[in-house]
Amino acid sequence: ASYQALVRALGEPGDDCPLFDNDFEQLIWMIGSVAGLQAALADVQANMAVGVPFNVAPKAERGMACLDDQKHNRKWWGLPKAIRSSLWTIVPGVTPEGVDPWAELDKARQLGMDEGVRLPSALDALVSYNDSNMQRVRNIIREHANSVQSTASNREYRMPASASSDLLLELSDRLWTENT
């Protein structure tokens, strides 16, 4: 539903970047892309039972290229890089040559922790869980807990900051439940 709202508001992500009128439109673009990523991940975990169209994830990846630069990654806590890198781990053939998506996720996660909005950490943990890399998930959860203690959440963006903590808590609970 969020991805469809993105399409209605700003058009289908793809080859052309929209002309963003303001920061809010950039935020909508990113949140809609995250929704596309989450839909693709959920469908993979459900053995494709949901029926998310195969083109949603690659379109979201191409759409995020509009904001995946140094300026926008700093401004948006590493989220553009995190979204693209996350998609590179699940969509075959979209990773740029010579790029390690996991190393890019590390960079994005650090930006998010530095800026007090840890959505890149949550995305990294989700795709790591999807990749069955439970050690990486546990490390991200620990790193997140330490970061929350050392760097205050960004007051201007409390909702996404809180959502990232909620996602990581849910993953932590899932790991605990699976192992008890």
Place the predicted regions along the sequence by residue.
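Helix-turn-helix repeat elements of alpha-solenoid scaffolds
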Residues: 1-15, 51-63, 95-102, 138-142
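Flexible helix-coil transition and linker loops at the boundaries of alpha-helical arrays
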Residues: 1-29, 64-75, 110-114, 150-158
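Amphipathic alpha-helical repeat scaffolds of TPR domains
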Residues: 18-47, 74-90, 117-127, 166-170
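Short helix-capping/linker segments at secondary-structure and domain boundaries
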Residues: 44, 93-96, 133
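Alpha-solenoid helical-repeat scaffolds
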Residues: 48-53, 70-73
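Flexible, glycine-rich surface segments
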Residues: 60-126
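A cross-kingdom marker for long, charged
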Residues: 105-180
